[in-house]
């Protein structure tokens, strides 16, 4: 997709950051793991702050989170903190209550700090021609197997045809009122919402797929932290050239 060069509308970004991150095997939420002297959450926020059209970043944190207030970025003028919920979708819904004076809202994983500015701009420029929104995504490259279970042992059931399969990434960008209504309907009707685009799909919309870079990883497992550190070092080297 061609990234247009045009003035971008003001956008509010939401970071659901109330999760515990138990798969990281840490004693505190994974968004507060550090690379260098900054937490993953700070690195993610700073990436978004580089875009002037992002007028506000709303961070939804756990009610018992005492880490965020200790971070220097908590005093940043464009950063607002709200209390999140027990699931991602509840955190996003609570944050949406505070979105004012914009037509577009962007949702980004709190532990996805390796976002390239070029990808972010490409996503933001879909506001020129879409009335729904879209997500960053990458085509599936690896062979995908559907698992079976025999005597409590995982086995290969069959191979999934990967043509037209994409990995959903974040950020995900949608019209504010449309995202609100789709999330509300999905929750009311008991639909499991794993990301924001799933709610729009359920309501019959087809968000755009905006090709992004595969190094825009979400830190989920312990080994991801070292990989994210490497990717960020490459980003820093590129910016310093």
Curated annotation (Swiss-Prot):
The keyword Nucleotidyltransferase applies. The record marks 162, 218 as: Positions MEP for the nucleophilic attack. Coiled coil: none annotated. The keyword Nucleotidyltransferase applies. Pfam families: IspD. PROSITE patterns: ISPD. It catalyses: 2-C-methyl-D-erythritol 4-phosphate + CTP + H(+) = 4-CDP-2-C-methyl-D-erythritol + diphosphate. It is an enzyme of class 2 (transferase). The record marks 23, 30 as: Transition state stabilizer. One of its GO terms (biological process) is isopentenyl diphosphate biosynthetic process, methylerythritol 4-phosphate pathway. Pathway: Isoprenoid biosynthesis; isopentenyl diphosphate biosynthesis via DXP pathway; isopentenyl diphosphate from 1-deoxy-D-xylulose 5-phosphate: step 2/6. Keywords: Isoprene biosynthesis, Nucleotidyltransferase, Transferase. GO terms for molecular function: 2-C-methyl-D-erythritol 4-phosphate cytidylyltransferase activity. Its EC number is 2.7.7.60. Catalyzes the formation of 4-diphosphocytidyl-2-C-methyl-D-erythritol from CTP and 2-C-methyl-D-erythritol 4-phosphate (MEP). Belongs to the IspD/TarI cytidylyltransferase family. IspD subfamily. This is 2-C-methyl-D-erythritol 4-phosphate cytidylyltransferase. It comes from Baumannia cicadellinicola subsp. Homalodisca coagulata.
